[in-house]
Structure formats: structure tokens, C-alpha cells
Amino acid sequence: MGPRRKPRTPRRRPSSPVPGPSRRSSRPGKRRKFLWLKEIKKLQRSTDLLLRKLPFSRVVREICGKFTRGVDLCWQAQALLALQEAAEAFLVHLFEDAYLLTLHAGRVTIFPKDIQLTRRIRGIEGGLG
């Protein structure tokens, strides 16, 4: 018979971490996976206006100038705010309906044809109803 082998004892891990890539950095997609969902939930909870006030007021004044033949009208801040609230509510409702059409078509991306069909279904006025 030959010499007996020593039984192997499991090695202990060092108490300090070994330098090298961490486990989290090896999977960068895991963290970004639900960022879009987190952003959607944050925006749904908020009641803030999403359009900037100054560019919106410029567009309102430009459109108003076309209808009044160049006469510059003064707008109250509350009137602009009410108009912006209505415009954002209209756009949110439009995109909700367009997204339903997108899901019906078996897609997740809204195409211009979805917006056009939404407006056509709503009719000429196309209000919030």
C-alpha cells in the first residue's frame, strides 16, 4: 500500500473582498430594466405641468397673433395657465386613446397613424369626450 493522502480541508474565504469587478457591474441591464416604468409611475402621481410655461405662452401668443391680424393682446397669467392645463389634458387623453389603438394592433410603439385614427374616431371637434 502506498502513502495515505491527507484529507482536504475547504479553504476559507478572506474576510476582505477581493479587488475586481463587483457583481452589480456585471449586469448593467438589470438596473435599467424598469427605469422607464419608474418614470411613468412618477409622472402619473404628479400633478405638475409637463410643458414649460414660457415656450407655451410664446406659441399661444403666436397663434393669437395670426387670428388678430398682428394685434398683440395682453394675456393674464391665470388665463395662460388655464389654457395650458386644458391643452395638457387634451394631449394626455389623446395619447391614452392612441396607445389603446397601438395595443389593439399588437404593438407597443405609437405611430403617427395611431394618432390620426384617434383623431378621426373622435370626430371634428375631438374634445375630451
UniProtKB/Swiss-Prot annotation:
Disulfide bonds: none annotated. It is found in: Nucleus; Chromosome, Centromere. The keyword Cell cycle does not apply. Residues 30-129 are annotated as: H3-like. GO terms for biological process: CENP-A containing chromatin assembly; establishment of mitotic spindle orientation; kinetochore assembly; mitotic cytokinesis; protein localization to chromosome, centromeric region. The modification Phosphoserine is found at S16, S22, S57. Keywords: ADP-ribosylation, Centromere, Chromosome, DNA-binding, Methylation, Nucleosome core, Nucleus, Phosphoprotein. GO terms for molecular function: DNA binding; protein heterodimerization activity; structural constituent of chromatin. Residues 1-30 are annotated as: Disordered. It comes from the Eukaryota. CDD domains: HFD_H3 (cd22911). The modification N,N,N-trimethylglycine is found at G2. Trimethylated by NTMT1 at the N-terminal glycine after cleavage of Met-1. Methylation is low before incorporation into nucleosomes and increases with cell cycle progression, with the highest levels in mitotic nucleosomes. Residues 1-14 have a biased composition (Basic residues). Histone H3-like nucleosomal protein that is specifically found in centromeric nucleosomes. Replaces conventional H3 in the nucleosome core of centromeric chromatin that serves as an assembly site for the inner kinetochore. The presence of CENPA subtly modifies the nucleosome structure and the way DNA is wrapped around the nucleosome and gives rise to protruding DNA ends that are less well-ordered and rigid compared to nucleosomes containing histone H3. May serve as an epigenetic mark that propagates centromere identity through replication and cell division. The CATD (CENPA targeting domain) region is responsible for the more compact structure of nucleosomes containing CENPA. It is necessary and sufficient to mediate the localization into centromeres. Component of centromeric nucleosomes, where DNA is wrapped around a histone octamer core. The octamer contains two molecules each of H2A, H2B, CENPA and H4 assembled in one CENPA-H4 heterotetramer and two H2A-H2B heterodimers. CENPA modulates the DNA-binding characteristics of nucleosomes so that protruding DNA ends have higher flexibility than in nucleosomes containing conventional histone H3. Inhibits binding of histone H1 to nucleosomes, since histone H1 binds preferentially to rigid DNA linkers that protrude from nucleosomes. This is Histone H3-like centromeric protein A. It comes from Cricetulus griseus (Chinese hamster). The lineage of its organism: Eukaryota, Metazoa, Chordata, Craniata, Vertebrata. The gene is CENPA.
